[in-house]
């Protein structure tokens, strides 16, 4: 391989966090129409998606809640539906619905679209400039219908941008430093815990840039509880298989899985999101460049 080609190949491996098109490609990536699309078709298709999702995000966030509404819905301790701080009354139905709504939107389409739009903008720039090819930009997120367990939420639906480096570091610590037997339950669950611990530190650093430091940030609480949910889930699934065997999952079993997944996330996700609503500048919760507000003001002046 010529020196220039080898250098570009090495550079690509260093910059493709998901290992796209390499032997290290992370699992569960769905390759869609971009695999066979021409550059022009890919750019047009991606630009349409960016525009549509950007406008929806702008519409959902251009009118932030007032300080009074923020305190009423996301006030100190409101993120806890269980084990509430002393002085807070038991959660009401409105609290439960707020937690569920924030989770379904923030960890469903709205949260994923915020990340996806940036990813697609980068793909347009890279493919448009000839730096990469369309097939190197598969969808960042999977289908939300895959998330009928916590494992599948993180492995099949949510983005895998940092899975490769995080798993590499956790595997090194478990196998080479701690020398845990492989396979074993200790190695399996410590690896998962370390991955979420690294993720929590990354989110804590992001919060810090927004001025939300410990103990205000809920990153550690939210992400370090994910392995607990996965362990409980694995135990329940093992018991189910022992009782029912390896029969294919029925639609009712999947329905129970969806309820479990989103119920658990509704208990822990607000631990991360509510402090952002409380302490972060509301302008940071919207799109980088608002479109709807200036348009409405323009037509209001014209009217």
UniProtKB/Swiss-Prot annotation:
- Top enzyme class of this protein? transferase
Assigned protein family: Belongs to the wax synthase family.
Question: Where is the protein localized?
Answer: Membrane
* Organism in which the protein naturally occurs: Aspergillus terreus (strain NIH 2624 / FGSC A1156)
Q: Does the keyword Ribosomal protein apply?
A: no
Q: Which biological pathway?
A: Mycotoxin biosynthesis
Which GO annotations describe the biological process of this protein? lipid metabolic process
A single Gene Ontology MF term assigned here is: O-acyltransferase activity
Query: What residues form the membrane-spanning segments?
Result: 42-62, 194-214, 257-277
Gene name of the record:
ataH
Q: What is this protein's name? A: Acetyltransferase ataH
- Reading the lineage from the top rank, the first entry is Eukaryota
- Which keywords label this protein? Acyltransferase, Membrane, Signal, Transferase, Transmembrane, Transmembrane helix
